């Protein structure tokens, strides 16, 4: 049996400890001994980006925000889907996570981050949202397990009314706001609707045909056509 290697540790501003592991060529980030994400399971992250970005493929000068770099799969799927003139802003709060992805020895997202369309920001995505009123055609937030249960307490505001309104304010007309979640959450879905959004809830698996089910919330301002 091949050993599990602990490669590095990061601590977020609220004290959450993230640990990077490698096993048999696959990488994972763990919190409290539990995989938060893995290079073996990223179908739902790919699906999130494809659902949000495919309708924008023919739109000129598209601007997209991704909250949370993770292991780079949402970013890579967005870049595969969007046009050459698109701009993708990625906000990641943990400098170590950025470093892991940029490390060519780990084969994670170094090539994607070097893409000329990418604007990588070492910052809390909440700060980027506050500074970006009316700037994005789409916002994808994959910064935690979803509204409940949170692994990082500092992410809570993003799933509350104030955070949802902040994200909505950062959208351009006809913009999309999407969230990745490990679980379904009827209360969060209702919070999106209470903010004046129409919401599509999509269930998708960690692998293309197997693995745990994850939930994607894809929201738009009510009354706008697709």
Where are these regions (language model features)?
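Active-site beta-loop-alpha junctions enriched in small/polar residues
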Residues: 182-184
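The AdoMet/dcAdoMet-binding core of the Class I SAM-like
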Residues: 42, 46-171, 179-180, 190, ...
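Glycine-centered, phosphate/nucleic-acid-interacting loop/turn motifs that mediate DNA/RNA or nucleotide
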Residues: 175
